[in-house]
């Protein structure tokens, strides 16, 4: 159906919805893999077009945990891994912040994306910092396995461990 519509009205590919999203970004947000592939077959230009909120389709897919779509975008547009949203966050920042552990694990295992773990956003936070700030303990374990990431400090001078220590109240009781 998408093919028929876009063949008849090719300009729809570049139209934006009321939230400022392109067709590709919308398809990525809802996990419509076949639609994403169809749109990428036609053109990859919208991979590099941000929404009104400053995020790109790869960020939208990551935020919603659509690993297959993130991988497809990376396969067809390898440089998209370097794209930053308006907060200076890459795709791994987004996955860590939201707690999409399977995506975090996938990105940290790939030789071409594991370096994203040392990326710092506009506040100097790495994906690990964001995972700690948002209590995404599963992602923390994966990200903390890289010693380089553990040593990085954000703009407040805090490591991820420092953030965790500052967030724990003295009367917390931990159970296993």
Regions flagged by a language model, labelled:
Residues 1, 34-35, 68-69, 102-103, ...:
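Conserved ankyrin/ankyrin-like repeat signature
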Residues 1-50, 54-55:
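Solenoidal tandem-repeat scaffolds enriched in leucines and small polar residues
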Residues 4-11, 38-45, 72-80, 108-115, ...:
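Ankyrin repeat domain, specifically the short helix-to-loop turn at the C-terminus of the second helix
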Residues 15-16, 49-50, 83-84, 119-120, ...:
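Ankyrin-repeat boundary/linker signal
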Residues 24, 58, 92, 128, ...:
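Conserved hydrophobic residue in the first alpha-helix
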